[in-house]
Regions:
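Hydrophobic h-region of N-terminal signal peptides that target proteins for export
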Residues: 2-12
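Low-complexity, acidic/polar, glycine-enriched regions of mature
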Residues: 11-195
Length: 195
């Protein structure tokens, strides 16, 4: 899940607002191109799950102090339009029995406004560490975030390479071959916790 960790906050600074991600209203996805070799046909495979947990900490007075993470996604629950693909990904590539979770923790928020007004969509970059299969790499998410009353709405995307996380792109017996580049997407709805 996403847990935003507070940065050194002195007594004079306002408290960070804590938003808990709502899995039933949120979704994590991957998109990866795959080529069916015998047919020369290209397809974009999409896998998704609602098993997304985490917290986001928001500083309305100084938005750049806001933090995300850890956000945790249960990889074993990813589903696409092909059960065969899903099983192969779980067993051979993501190995989600051994490594069931992907985890992201932010280190920096870039492009945040100096002040925030409720309802205002904000485009920013969230930099941090993504861990998949026990391998951690620095990634940059491009995000649009909006606070609407007690809820935080966010859409974010980043691109990674499978080989950067220690596994080769899926290739099944000359039938289908996936690209190395994968787009990761998050649609998050989080609710502010009572102080």
């Amino acid at each position: 899940m996403v847990v935003l960790a507070a940065v050194a906050a002195g007594a004079a600074q306002p408290a960070l607002e804590r938003y808990q991600i709502l899995p039933e209203a949120s979704e994590a996805r991957y998109r990866v191109g795959e080529t069916f070799l015998g047919e020369g046909r290209f397809n974009v495979a999409v896998g998704r799950t609602r098993d997304v947990r985490g917290v986001i900490l928001v500083d309305r007075q100084r938005p750049a102090r806001s933090r995300v993470g850890p956000i945790v996604v249960d990889l074993s629950t990813l589903q696409s339009d092909s059960a065969r693909r899903d099983n192969a990904i779980r067993q051979r590539w993501l190995e989600s029995t051994r490594f069931p979770e992907a985890r992201f923790v932010s280190t920096e928020v870039r492009g945040a406004p100096s002040r925030y007004r409720d309802g205002q969509p904000v485009e920013l970059e969230v930099v941090g560490d993504l861990t998949v299969r026990g391998v951690t790499r620095r990634v940059v998410w491009k995000a649009t975030v909006r606070l609407a009353g007690p809820e935080l709405l966010a859409q974010a995307a980043t691109s990674v390479r499978m080989t950067d996380f220690g596994f080769q792109p899926p290739s099944i017996l000359g039938f289908v071959r996936a690209e190395d580049d994968v787009t990761l997407e998050l649609d998050l709805v989080a609710r502010r916790e009572s102080p």
